[in-house]
């Protein structure tokens, strides 16, 4: 999106310089150069912030991966401790005593 903006600004500068009179040309050219410098600085700032956000995304992904690995480790320890309770077969189940008269 930012390269489009730079292209549009350059196109506007070319159109404005083509329509400018000879007397107003230097004034218009100076103002357009100032505008172009400001626009290029804005684009550079936007690109640097995008790069910083990419670094932040990579860092947060690493943090999330570590958290999920830790969670999986806790879950496996939990399931290992209680596996005996969950895997009890039908012969291990309690039977209700029957009373005979």
From Swiss-Prot:
Membrane spanning stretches: none
Entry-annotated residues carrying Methionine sulfoxide: 64
Tissue distribution: Synthesized predominantly in liver and to a lesser degree in intestine.
Glycosylation sites (chain numbering): 96
GO biological process, one term: response to xenobiotic stimulus
Cell compartments where the protein resides: Secreted
Family recorded in the similarity comment: Belongs to the apolipoprotein C3 family.
Gene Ontology CC terms, in alphabetical order: chylomicron; extracellular space; intermediate-density lipoprotein particle; spherical high-density lipoprotein particle; very-low-density lipoprotein particle
One Pfam family recorded for the sequence: Apo-CIII
PTM note: The most abundant glycoforms are characterized by an O-linked disaccharide galactose linked to N-acetylgalactosamine (Gal-GalNAc), further modified with up to 3 sialic acid residues. Less abundant glycoforms are characterized by more complex and fucosylated glycan moieties. O-glycosylated on Thr-96 with a core 1 or possibly core 8 glycan.
Keywords: Chylomicron, Glycoprotein, Lipid degradation, Lipid metabolism, Lipid transport, Oxidation, Secreted, Sialic acid, Signal, Transport, VLDL
Annotated region described as Lipid-binding, given as residue ranges: 69-101
The protein's name in its UniProt record: Apolipoprotein C-III
GO MF annotations in UniProt: enzyme regulator activity; high-density lipoprotein particle receptor binding; lipase inhibitor activity; lipid transporter activity; phospholipid binding
UniProt source species: Rattus norvegicus
Site feature May interact with the LDL receptor, where: 41
Signal peptide positions on this chain: 1-20
Main location: secreted
């Amino acid at each position: 999106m930012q390269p489009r903006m730079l292209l549009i600004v350059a196109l506007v500068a070319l159109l404005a310089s083509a329509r400018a009179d000879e007397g107003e040309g230097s004034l218009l050219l100076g103002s357009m150069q100032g505008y172009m410098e400001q626009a290029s600085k804005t684009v550079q700032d936007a690109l640097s912030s995008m790069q910083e956000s990419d670094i932040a995304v990579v860092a947060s992904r690493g943090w999330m991966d570590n958290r999920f690995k830790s969670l999986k480790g806790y879950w496996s320890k939990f399931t290992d401790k209680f596996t005996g309770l969950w895997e009890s077969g039908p012969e291990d189940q309690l039977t209700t005593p029957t009373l005979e008269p």
